[in-house]
């Protein structure tokens, strides 16, 4: 399990940092953030969540000499061809979560019922300074509401309704959200892999 191992979280998003710290707590790792280092992060130019997560994790691991964990995640609306996808954090060039939510609702105003189905996807990449990297993924199906509900969470959480739970992510606390969320599922996959120590590299490495 490597309790006390220092790992750098490569996101500056406070919501993601909070959920990652909560989810990784059982491992006993010492979690650092980008605020602990003077790094200029590379642009996220990957075409997939995996490419972006690998880019961030590998860069930070090499720059700091420490293992680095990157989270690249986003919302995919089926009727919009997978938008916003890898552009979730900068959708439509909007600057804030609220503006992006409004923009998404505008893009979906003609969609009803089944046409509003969507999913959240999360890819975690844990990269080591020697170049080894591992990926853990999670996804959750849901529906985009026609108006926001709830005060918690971040990003598109107020719009993403989880039928199984009967509420949006923004209506859930951290623990409940982790049970259902894409990030929670990816974190559980990582926890399972590390429950008896680091997984065999020939099994866990990214091809």
Swiss-Prot record:
Its EC number is 3.6.1.66. GO terms for molecular function: dITP diphosphatase activity; ITP diphosphatase activity; metal ion binding; nucleotide binding; ribonucleoside triphosphate phosphatase activity; XTP diphosphatase activity. Substrate binds at residues 11-16, 73, 154-157, 177, 182-183. Its cofactor is Mg(2+). InterPro entries: dITP/XTP_pyrophosphatase (IPR020922), ITPase-like_fam (IPR029001), RdgB/HAM1 (IPR002637). Mg(2+) binds at residue 72. Keywords: Hydrolase, Magnesium, Metal-binding, Nucleotide metabolism, Nucleotide-binding. It catalyses: XTP + H2O = XMP + diphosphate + H(+); dITP + H2O = dIMP + diphosphate + H(+); ITP + H2O = IMP + diphosphate + H(+). Binds 1 Mg(2+) ion per subunit. Coiled coil: none annotated. The active site is at 72 (proton acceptor). Pfam families: Ham1p_like. GO terms for cellular component: cytosol. Signal peptide: none annotated. It is an enzyme of class 3 (hydrolase). One of its GO terms (biological process) is nucleotide metabolic process. Pyrophosphatase that catalyzes the hydrolysis of nucleoside triphosphates to their monophosphate derivatives, with a high preference for the non-canonical purine nucleotides XTP (xanthosine triphosphate), dITP (deoxyinosine triphosphate) and ITP. Seems to function as a house-cleaning enzyme that removes non-canonical purine nucleotides from the nucleotide pool, thus preventing their incorporation into DNA/RNA and avoiding chromosomal lesions. Belongs to the HAM1 NTPase family. Homodimer. This is dITP/XTP pyrophosphatase. It comes from Thermus thermophilus (strain ATCC BAA-163 / DSM 7039 / HB27).
